[in-house]
Amino acid sequence: MAEPRTASPRRLPALRRPGFLPPLLPPPPPPLLLLLLLLPLPAPSLGLGHSAELAFSVEPNDDIANPGQPIVLGCKVEGTPPVQVSWRKNGAELPEGTHTTLLANGSLLIHHFRLEQGGSPSDEGDYECVAQNRFGLLVSRKARLQAATMSDFHVHPQAVTGEEGGVARFQCQIHGLPKPLITWEKNRVPIDTDDERYTLLPKGVLQITGLRAEDSGIFHCVASNIASVRVSHGARLTVSGSGSGTYKEPTILVGPENLTLTVHQTAVLECVATGNPRPIVSWSRLDGRPIGVEGIQVLGTGNLIISDVTVQHSGVYVCAANRPGTRVRRTAQGRLVVQAPAEFVQHPQSISRPAGTTAMFTCQAQGEPPPHVTWLKNGQVLGAGGHVRLKNNNSTLSISGVGPEDEAIYQCVAENIAGSSQASARLTVLWAEGLPGPPRNVRAVSVSSTEVRVSWSEPLAHTKEIIGYVLHIRKAADSPKLEYQEAVSKSTFQHLVRDLEPSTAYSFYIKAYTPRGASLASVPTLASTLGEAPVPPPLSVRLLGSSSLQLLWKPWPRLAQHNGGFKLFYRPVSATSFTGPILLPGTVSSYNLSQLDPSTVYEVKLLAYNQHGDGNATVRFVSLKGASERTALTPPCDCRKEDVTNHTSTTGIVIGIHIGVTCIIFCVLFLLFGQRGRVLLCKDVENQLSPPQGPRSQRDPGILALNGLSRGEGGQLSRDEKPVDAKELEQLFPTAGSAAQPGSTPTDPAAPAPCEETQLSMVQLQGFNLVAGRTTEATSPCAGPGPVPAPQDIGPVPLSEGQTQPPAVAAPQ
């Protein structure tokens, strides 16, 4: 167990090297000063400052306190009196009471810092100083007040055994607020900080180089801050005999850790190396940039110290341990990230603008990481909307059509993880003489569910210079930031506002504009659009399985505001009644139908409803055959040998192949040589030359939705099909002309086409295998006698080596 101990008044060193000053525990405040702080002073209201602009000359800072300790959060304001100062805690107004006192200069005194107990709230939190005068309101940066704490050790030092001349390292870790100061004791006595062999690092590390026998002992880690003092468990150091005669490769025992610091802090990159002979430790940056010399120091035998770090010090640092006189080296690396709090490169400037014009503030801040910029108007967060625009990552604030309601103090607040900063500016709206008054008699009348007609009368005075009107529109339930505008001609005194939402209340007001500025706004008027039943919702279908499907649509959350939702119906097309309605809320976007008949076509209806009734339905016809049937398309020419009795014999297979090839040749020759039409073909071949009538499930395995895209009852072709045309085939096969060659003898159109040996080439067309052929001198025994016209010269038939006949082509199965 860690042993609690009363804090000693001695100084506690952090870095034991020349050039490093040991930090001190904060001394108690002088009694006289403490007495003055505790004296209550009257609340400030007058004469805080005489600068024209309201601004903070002192802002509160973060602080850490012990319970019972008095705390003062500083705040000083300059500006045109009278100035009222108040405080906020965690965003809420902090009431005055006996526990806190507002001092004359605007600072806040907390008499006795307390934690939450017995129903009393804790004083921990974020505090803001608020200043206000007749020009506006200003809020300071946030100051965080925390209680001092000290945890138990979560890493205690461990026993170490080393050789004479070697290196020993102890480490302890503990958390606390403020960060604990770590010191070390040997055998209950503070270690000798004058011994250069002892190196103390502020993160709780003790390094001992050049070990000697007298270094043996028990070491303790001592952590202290304003909250407490704690002592770790003891760890024994045992130093054995010298091993200087044994060669050892250089080894890095501990390399640098990844560090994240804030600018102006001190970075300690540790590197402990051993070996025999003792290795030489050096440092470099991974990106090749020089480390530099200003603020750089090596502590002990290889620890790199960077004082007053900047963002430029960020990078990866490499520790190298080299064996003297050789290139043998070991390396370790760690990343240093330096963060910088937000600070302003460009402050917003106070401006004056005529009424009705545009005011613009620019605020640019830098920091690491890049800060986020927020705008405040009189202490309240200002968002984009209406006539307020934020551009360039919130660095530019634009206010169009400024009016008296826009006069305020605007603050730019830049904040990142390292800190925050604020700057302010004031907007003054100028009113020119002779501006028209506000438009009069503004009325709004509902015309339909999406339209409202707004009418008005021109102002009483100064109407000759009016160049137009601007109508401001927003939902009555929305913030003024969400309003939008529509411009109207100067000769028009009514305007039809379109594209509104049904059954919704809207607010309207209007301004008159002249070259010198805008008038005051008219009195706002309200009107509600008429109600109507919802429009049909878009509906799509997705297949889930052979007997289930999913219906999809877009949710309409607005339906819930008008006592509405969706109604779903479905039925087989052969049924007389629907299943349903299935009532669904407006936030639902899908519904699954299951246990359906795969062989049945279903009719599905979806409609939206509200307090005005049911809207029109969206209807879909859905078939599940695409999921239940995965069969190939029927071949276009399905000529079969009717008298084949043994389908499994080799002879039957060969005969079937020849018959199939012959029928395909007949089909192609008939299509290629149109003059040979009126060929007597078997009825099966003629039927198969027609476009297929069944659903093309093989091309589209999804749902077949029968919504005017599929084939009708009359046998018309679907959208993606077309009949086979002889002219189209001539374009596809230009070498196979339809006219007879010179010298050929015309054949009897009633005579059957000869069946000849061919060499085939397959071309895919509309789901059919079309065959283009070349005739040879030999005739097929299946055709009658008759001359065959020679085809166009398309060259000799190529034969492979050792081949005497054209290769056989497998018939489609």
Curated annotation (Swiss-Prot):
What range does the record give for the signal peptide? 1-47
The residues covered by the Ig-like C2-type domain are 49-151, 151-232, 250-333, 341-428
Is Hydrolase a UniProt keyword of this protein?
no
Keyword Transmembrane helix (UniProt): yes
Positions of region (Disordered): 1-21, 689-724, 775-813
PROSITE patterns on file: FN3, IG_LIKE
Keyword terms of this UniProt record: Disulfide bond, Glycoprotein, Immunoglobulin domain, Membrane, Repeat, Signal, Transmembrane, Transmembrane helix
Output the GO biological process annotations, alphabetical, semicolon-separated.
neuromuscular process controlling balance
Q: Where are the transmembrane segments?
A: 653-673
Name the record gives this protein: Immunoglobulin superfamily DCC subclass member 3
Subcellular localization is given as: Membrane
> InterPro entries recorded for this chain?
FN3_dom (IPR003961), FN3_sf (IPR036116), Ig-like_dom (IPR007110), Ig-like_dom_sf (IPR036179), Ig-like_fold (IPR013783), Ig_I-set (IPR013098), Ig_sub (IPR003599), Ig_sub2 (IPR003598)
Output the Pfam families linked to this UniProt entry.
fn3 (PF00041), I-set (PF07679), Ig_3 (PF13927)
Q: Which GO terms describe its cellular component?
A: membrane
Which body tissues produce this protein? Detected in cerebellum, kidney, heart, lung, skeletal muscle and spleen.
Q: Start and end of every Fibronectin type-III domain?
A: 438-532, 535-630
Composition bias type Low complexity, residue spans: 9-19
For membrane topology, the record states:
Single-pass membrane protein
The domain of life is Eukaryota
